[in-house]
Structure formats: structure tokens, C-alpha cells
């Protein structure tokens, strides 16, 4: 266990060089390309998951929106695999860094908004002022809608960061409590260890759910602008 509670969120380095780039590239090695005539089980599961998620997520889109299918499927695989790898002992989770999550959220959000203004300029501008708004409230509503638009990428990034960070902190605290209680009461330590195992299983689910939620919200932003 790390002595510092937040040590697991510090970017690891070797000889002063940050390893975050290598860590970010590592999940891509887990999903081999189906180059063989007969695929193995890993590739089959990968293709089945992609088809299942793409059908559920992309059915609401028109032709322009469906051109984003490959990008969104790559996004959910990347975030999900990164979150799962971060649950391994002595590992680092890049999605606990707000800067990285903003780096994913802002370009994707900006792409959907720019597409909306290019393809549906009048409809996109109409979102800033609901129909039937009283004249004295027009300036205030325009400001509020503008703020709500620009806060969307921040909400995406903060949601992912907060959920992943909170889970890791809880696992760290309960794991430390289990080690400390072993010298006091083995029964209490065993109960705490069972809680840790259940929390770890929950974090595996949270890792995949947060990847799905992040991608789903990007898909909804895309649907609103296509």
C-alpha cells in the first residue's frame, strides 16, 4: 500500500521522463486487429461488444451522425480498458487526471457543436432562446443557455474524474484499514476484507459504466447537432 493517499494519482516517471504516453497507448495493444481468416475468442468478444454497443447507441442517429460510429466505439473501448487496467495493483489510471479527461471531452464536444452550427445554424441558434420567452428575460436566458452549453465538456470530464477517483480512494482506505485491523481483530479485518472484495467488484462495473456514460453523452450531444 502507498503511504501517501494520493500517490496513486501521480503520473509515474522513469529517469525523469513521464510514462503517461506509454500508459495511454498500452490499452490499444489489448485489442488485436482481426487479420486472420479464423479469429480467436478475444477478437470475437471484441467484435460482439462493438456491434452490441453500436446498435444501442447509434440507432438514434441519421447518416451524418453514424459517421462517428468508429470514433465513439474506439472511445468507449479506450476509456473502459484504461479504467480496468487502473484497478490492477501498483498501476496508474490516466482517467483520474482532469486534464486528460478535458483533453478528450473538449475536442469531441467542440466537434459536435461546430457540426451543428454548420449543418443546422438556425436550429442551433434557436436553442439559446426558447420559444415564447418574455422580452425582459431574453438577455438572461441567452446568457444562461450559453453557460450551460460551455459547461457540457466540463461536466463530462468532472463526472468521469470524480467517479474513478472516488472509487480508488475508497479501495485505498479500506485496504489500509484491513491491514491495520489484522493486528487488532482478525474477525473485523476479515469483514473489512470482504467489503474490499465487494467494492473491487463494484469498481469493475463502475469502470465500464463510466466509459459507456461518457460515450453516450457525447453521442447525445452529436444527436442534438445533426
UniProtKB/Swiss-Prot annotation:
Organism of origin: Hippopotamus amphibius (Hippopotamus)
Family per record: Belongs to the ATPase A chain family.
Membrane-spanning residues: 6-26, 68-88, 97-117, 138-158, 164-184, 200-222
Function: Subunit a, of the mitochondrial membrane ATP synthase complex (F(1)F(0) ATP synthase or Complex V) that produces ATP from ADP in the presence of a proton gradient across the membrane which is generated by electron transport complexes of the respiratory chain. ATP synthase complex consist of a soluble F(1) head domain - the catalytic core - and a membrane F(1) domain - the membrane proton channel. These two domains are linked by a central stalk rotating inside the F(1) region and a stationary peripheral stalk.
Key word Mitochondrion present: yes
Entry keyword set: ATP synthesis, CF(0), Hydrogen ion transport, Ion transport, Membrane, Mitochondrion, Mitochondrion inner membrane, Transmembrane, Transmembrane helix, Transport
Record InterPro entries: ATP_synth_F0_asu, ATP_synth_F0_asu_AS, ATP_synth_F0_asu_bact/mt, F0_ATP_A_sf
Record GO biological process: proton motive force-driven ATP synthesis; proton transmembrane transport
PROSITE patterns to which the protein is assigned, alphabetical: ATPASE_A
GO CC term (a single one): proton-transporting ATP synthase complex
Domain of life per record: Eukaryota
Entry-linked PANTHER family: ATP SYNTHASE SUBUNIT A
Subcellular location: Mitochondrion inner membrane
Single GO MF descriptor: proton-transporting ATP synthase activity, rotational mechanism
Topological category with respect to the lipid bilayer: Multi-pass membrane protein
Principal localisation: mitochondrion
Catalytic reactions on record: H(+)(in) = H(+)(out)
Self-association state and partner proteins as the record states: Component of the ATP synthase complex composed at least of ATP5F1A/subunit alpha, ATP5F1B/subunit beta, ATP5MC1/subunit c (homooctomer), MT-ATP6/subunit a, MT-ATP8/subunit 8, ATP5ME/subunit e, ATP5MF/subunit f, ATP5MG/subunit g, ATP5MK/subunit k, ATP5MJ/subunit j, ATP5F1C/subunit gamma, ATP5F1D/subunit delta, ATP5F1E/subunit epsilon, ATP5PF/subunit F6, ATP5PB/subunit b, ATP5PD/subunit d, ATP5PO/subunit OSCP.
One of the Pfam families matching this protein, by short name: ATP-synt_A
Protein's name according to its UniProt entry: ATP synthase F(0) complex subunit a
